[in-house]
Regions:
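Extended, subdomain-level signal for the structured scaffold at the beginning of enzyme domains
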Residues: 1-68
Length: 68
Protein backbone atom coordinates (compact mmCIF):
# COMPACT_ATOMS: atom_id res chain seq x y z
CA UNK A 1 0.00 0.00 0.00
CA UNK A 2 1.20 3.48 -0.91
CA UNK A 3 -0.10 6.66 0.67
CA UNK A 4 -0.16 9.95 -1.24
CA UNK A 5 -0.37 12.86 1.19
CA UNK A 6 -2.29 16.00 0.20
CA UNK A 7 -2.25 19.37 1.96
CA UNK A 8 -3.89 22.62 0.86
CA UNK A 9 -1.78 24.26 -1.84
CA UNK A 10 -0.39 20.99 -3.24
CA UNK A 11 0.83 21.04 -6.84
CA UNK A 12 -1.89 19.24 -8.81
CA UNK A 13 0.40 17.76 -11.47
CA UNK A 14 2.83 16.40 -8.87
CA UNK A 15 -0.02 14.69 -7.02
CA UNK A 16 -2.53 13.60 -9.63
CA UNK A 17 -0.14 12.33 -12.33
CA UNK A 18 1.57 9.80 -10.00
CA UNK A 19 -1.82 8.85 -8.53
CA UNK A 20 -3.22 8.18 -12.00
CA UNK A 21 -0.17 6.19 -13.11
CA UNK A 22 -0.15 4.06 -9.96
CA UNK A 23 -3.85 3.26 -10.24
CA UNK A 24 -3.51 2.37 -13.94
CA UNK A 25 -0.67 0.01 -12.98
CA UNK A 26 -2.96 -1.61 -10.36
CA UNK A 27 -0.72 -0.40 -7.52
CA UNK A 28 -2.73 0.05 -4.34
CA UNK A 29 -2.60 3.73 -3.38
CA UNK A 30 -4.77 5.89 -1.14
CA UNK A 31 -4.81 9.66 -0.78
CA UNK A 32 -4.50 11.13 2.71
CA UNK A 33 -5.91 14.57 3.43
CA UNK A 34 -3.49 16.21 5.85
CA UNK A 35 -5.57 19.40 6.09
CA UNK A 36 -9.02 17.83 5.89
CA UNK A 37 -11.27 15.56 3.85
CA UNK A 38 -11.37 18.03 0.95
CA UNK A 39 -8.00 19.44 -0.13
CA UNK A 40 -7.52 22.28 -2.62
CA UNK A 41 -4.44 22.48 -4.81
CA UNK A 42 -2.45 25.54 -5.84
CA UNK A 43 -4.57 26.04 -8.98
CA UNK A 44 -7.99 25.61 -7.39
CA UNK A 45 -8.58 21.89 -8.01
CA UNK A 46 -10.30 20.32 -4.99
CA UNK A 47 -9.80 16.62 -4.25
CA UNK A 48 -11.68 14.43 -1.78
CA UNK A 49 -9.08 12.40 0.11
CA UNK A 50 -9.58 8.67 0.62
CA UNK A 51 -8.35 8.73 4.22
CA UNK A 52 -7.71 10.95 7.22
CA UNK A 53 -4.23 10.75 8.82
CA UNK A 54 -5.58 8.81 11.80
CA UNK A 55 -6.91 6.10 9.45
CA UNK A 56 -3.48 5.16 8.08
CA UNK A 57 -2.22 1.65 8.82
CA UNK A 58 1.56 1.40 9.04
CA UNK A 59 1.44 -2.41 9.20
CA UNK A 60 1.43 -2.88 5.43
CA UNK A 61 3.06 0.20 3.91
CA UNK A 62 5.25 0.09 0.81
CA UNK A 63 5.88 3.82 0.45
CA UNK A 64 4.63 7.38 0.51
CA UNK A 65 4.28 10.13 -2.09
CA UNK A 66 4.77 13.72 -0.92
CA UNK A 67 3.86 16.09 -3.75
CA UNK A 68 4.96 19.72 -3.59
Amino acid sequence: MFYLFLADGFEETEALAPLDMMRRAKIEVKTVGVTGEFVTGSHGVTVKADLKPEEISFNNIDGVVLPG
